[in-house]
Amino acid sequence: ANVRLVTTAKEATKLCGEMFSRGGKAVTPGYMSDFRRKIESTTGLRHFLTKVQRMPGAVLSIRHQRRLMPRQQGYVYFQDYVPGNTHDTRVVAIGGRAFAFRRMNRPGDFRASGSGNIVYDPGLIDPRCIRIALKVTADLGARCLAFDFVTDDAQGPLIVEVSYTFVAGAFHGCPGYWDDCLTWHEGQFWPQDLILHDLLAALGHRAARSGSERRGTNRQ
């Protein structure tokens, strides 16, 4: 995603000028900075060679994404930066269930999204994140939402992003989920299976209710 850390008013002014003129690319970083980040995260020769072998595919993927997404212009969003976070917490709420994991920051970067460094230990998840995600999803009347949280020492967990799409493979790695009573349920699931299950259950309840109403009308 096109997310940058702006540290001065001068940088903010420059960014506004850019976004309200020629605009900016929807997919960052550039090829070389992405290559450097991947190389810096290697842990040995074999890992290094694997990264090098994958780079042509990564470059093609970035080029493809940039073709699909036009330059962004005419708007700019600013969000408070919350320092001191080594990770964010991704919570996916589906039908009263909450799946969660930590995404560790990229080396030398403040961002966790897209790092691929995921920790699935449920004991590390702040239960406040679970409660907030389930409540917001219910309040919005949504069936499925993904939340990204960071933690502020004074304010506690803060939502930095809400999405309706997410990577299913990362979700499937969760060893279980919490229900709306914060009871833990073991098992691995695919989000699309749960969404379909909930949809069919809702249709079944609707059909049963409709049938009951028709029978009541006929008796009258």
Residue ranges and their predicted role:
Residues A1-Y75, P127-I130:
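Active-site nucleotide/adenylate-binding loops and adjacent lid/helix of ATP-dependent enzymes
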Residues S41-T43, T50-R54, A98-F99, F110-G114, ...:
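Short acidic/polar alpha-helix capping motifs at helix-coil junctions
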Residues L124-P127, K135:
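Signature of lipid phosphatidyltransferase scaffolds
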